[in-house]
């Protein structure tokens, strides 16, 4: 019996992760605010009450559902940093109400798989080593807040993955293991098949 934290989004959950990881296209500037609401709408619609207008990010279907998400724009040598801290505020808010919580995140491999390469021809999987330290930082900060369960959604496990992506799962989750943090790896839409 947990209250899930991390499943709310003003616009979409993939966009929340892009903001959290600092994956904001240069055309939108580098300044983020405490809540990033205006930035979210500039990314989604190209305009908001504050900031300069810019072409909106591409939107596409989340797998084969009718849910649409903003596609992360990944560039060669993409840097990732913990740039949006709303998740931790949401954890504290739920804890203050006395509820046991479980945090939910999109997994690093699904996040990269669902992104799109801009500015050159490169393999998205090459960005995994730069993204994993941000996940590790998130997990460490959640543990410091007393969180003991994190659900990590990896729906790409239901796809026919190339061997390089399959192998990356073991490598990634070996690095993300924490003794005092239970990771609930989830997938949906279909079975694991050969994954």
Q: What kind of feature is each model-predicted range?
A:
Residues 1-195:
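Domain-level signal for soluble alpha/beta catalytic cores
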């Amino acid at each position: 019996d947990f209250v899930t934290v991390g499943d709310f989004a003003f616009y979409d959950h993939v966009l929340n992760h892009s903001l959290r990881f600092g994956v904001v296209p240069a055309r939108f500037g580098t300044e983020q605010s405490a809540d990033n609401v205006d930035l979210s709408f500039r990314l989604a619609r190209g305009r908001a009450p504050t900031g300069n207008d810019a072409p909106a990010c591409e939107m596409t279907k989340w797998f084969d559902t009718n849910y649409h998400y903003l596609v992360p724009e990944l560039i060669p040598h993409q840097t990732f940093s913990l740039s949006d801290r709303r998740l931790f505020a949401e954890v504290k808010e739920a804890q203050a109400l006395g509820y046991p919580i479980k945090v939910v995140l999109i997994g690093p491999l699904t996040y990269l798989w669902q992104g799109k390469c801009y500015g050159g021809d490169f393999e998205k999987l090459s960005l995994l080593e730069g993204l994993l330290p941000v996940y590790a930082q998130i997990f460490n900060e959640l543990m410091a807040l007393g969180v003991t369960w994190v659900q990590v959604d990896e729906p790409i496990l239901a796809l026919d993955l190339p061997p390089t992506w399959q192998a990356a799962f073991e490598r990634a989750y070996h690095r993300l293991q924490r003794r005092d943090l239970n990771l609930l790896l989830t997938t949906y839409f279909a079975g694991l098949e050969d994954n």
